[in-house]
Amino acid sequence: MNNILITSAGRRVSLVRFFQKELKSVFAEAKVFTTDANPDYASACRISDGYFKMQRVTEPNYIDDLLQLAIKNDVKIIVPTIDTELLILSKNIEVFKSKGIEVVISDYEIMKIFRDKRLTHQFFEKYGINCAKEYSKENYQLPIYIKPYDGSRSVDNFIITTQEQLTDYHFQNDKLLFLEYLDHKKHTEFTIDLYYDKNSDLKCFVPRQRIEVRDGEVNKAVTKDAFFIPEIWKKMQHIDGFRGCITFQVFVNLDTQQIFGIEINPRFGGGYPLSY
C-alpha cells in the first residue's frame, strides 16, 4: 500500500485534503495518515484517513517511534510540516529510506543553512540574490530591523526607528541580528512556492503576494504572475540537496523593482492552498 503520513498536521486541513485527492487518483485504496501531539484537537487529523498521537520531536525516541509507525501502516512517503522537525528528519533520511520510506525533505546540510539566518544570507549572496544588510552592533544605521538568527513566527522581532528604542537586551542578546530595515510601505512582499524533484531540479514555481500575516505565517494572500519569475527560476533552477516544497520569501521594491531575499523555509508553507 502506498500510504502517505503527514506529521504535525495541526490545522492543515487543506493540505491533507489535497494529498488525499491526488493520492487516490493514482492509488484508489491508499490512505493519507496524520500525526500530532494532540490529534483529538487537530482539525487536519480529524479529516485524515487515520491519525496517531506522536510524542514531540524533542523526545529521544521520536525517530524510532515514527519509523515503526510508518512501517506498521504501510507508509511510503512522510511529509513534515513544521520547522522543528526538519533537522532531525533530514539527518535520518537514510534510516527511513532503508525501509523503503521516502521523507519529502531536503538534505541535512541544506536544513542547517536555513535554520540560521546568517547562513541564509550567505546562500542568497552565493546565488546572486540581494538581501538586507547585516550591521554590527557597534556600527549600524537607523532604521533597523532586529530578529534572532534562529527565530521563527516573528518572535523577538523589532522595528527600531530611534536610538531610544534600543535597550540592553538588544545589545546583549547574541542571537539578535541588526539588519537593514526594508520598509513595508516601499516594498511588496511575496512568498514563492518552489517544487524540486528527487534530482534537485526546479519543476514548478508559484508566487503569492502576502496581504496579511499572523504570527509570522501568511493569513491572506493572492497568487500572482510576477515579473521576477524568469530571474528567480534561472538562479534557482538547480540547487544541490533541494527536494520537495521550498517556500522562499522576498520583498520587491515598488520603485526600483529590486528583489530582496528574506528567508527560506524548506517545507510546505501555510499558504500552500493558494498554490494548489
Residues of each region from the PLM?
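ATP-binding N-terminal substructure of ATP-dependent carboxylate-amine bond-forming enzymes
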Residues: 1-104
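Glycine-rich phosphate/pyrophosphate-binding beta-alpha loops
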Residues: 154, 211-221, 265-275
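Short gly/pro/ser/thr-enriched loop/turn and capping motifs at secondary-structure boundaries
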Residues: 40-42, 86, 109-113, 213
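Catalytic phosphate/metal-binding cores of nucleic-acid and nucleotide-processing enzymes, i.e., regions
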Residues: 248
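Active-site nucleotide/adenylate-binding loops and adjacent lid/helix of ATP-dependent enzymes
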Residues: 108-188, 196-201, 226
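Phosphate-binding site of ATP-dependent enzymes
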Residues: 160-240, 251-260
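Short loop/turn motifs at secondary-structure junctions
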Residues: 28, 47, 74, 130, ...
